[in-house]
């Protein structure tokens, strides 16, 4: 497979200028994310229908032409299972490609599994079996091997022609508009940034804690997320989640107590004094400053029956629409709906099952069903 390497600012500028004459491109990224909070970009792959380009980001300092291309609405961008790629674009360039279409989403509206992999898609459409042995390689190491580069090039070379076929299938089935709506929703979901002050709500078993312990967890989770972003370190490499919960639960007053509840030596050495200061701050809060107790969704009266009834409604809609129930509503989305209905968690805007194409199919029936489950 022929491809060109792009390693300098001038080469990137020339490539982006030429590419903007094409109506559509296939995109992919390779990145590493083992200990870091943010994904570390290792390679960008691009195919315009004539040229496969592999862009090495390590030597490029001026990304303006790339940003301009990604925002050029005259050039459609196709990715496959692109949720993590979107995060890479957002963190590297501060933007989302526009317009963007995810071929995994297109395929789901044409009857394929929701998590249909790229290799399976290529095999169905071309009969070829791709070598995926390089998928876990270190994309930051240099030089990249010929095998790595061939693997990376294949990801976009086959994607673009298949994307065209999937667009035709989605249009023929009548679901193209819904598929594009789902692509937009995926982008919005990726752009949501967790407020450090709300990070405590995502800690497992937070609902088991009493109000002062919750106040402590709120302070601890806020600090940990800010520290992770500041140092570009995965949150569990700052302090492990179960250890953070234990600090909030037992509210220790000394380094020795931190050790006794299971914190690692490095956690105590680097962060012990900070953790103890946050515990002391939580201890000093007046009662009126403490958060309300957290209610666990699964402990709500009627949760299991409500979940079962929603699943049944989703299955009925799936049968009527000839879409998979998995595409219509995941467990996460059903739980999001019930959290929204019972007002257990703060939510930004309308819950996903009530919005967009899902809302058009299900909102009225869901509202009627939920009337039978008051808080």
Regions found by a protein language model. Name each.
Residues 146, 166-375:
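Accessory DNA-binding and partner-docking regions appended to nucleic-acid-acting proteins
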Residues 3-13, 17-27, 32-169:
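Conserved DEDDh/DEDDy metal-dependent 3′-5′ exonuclease domain
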Residues 2-3, 53, 106, 208, ...:
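Short, contiguous strand/loop micro-motifs
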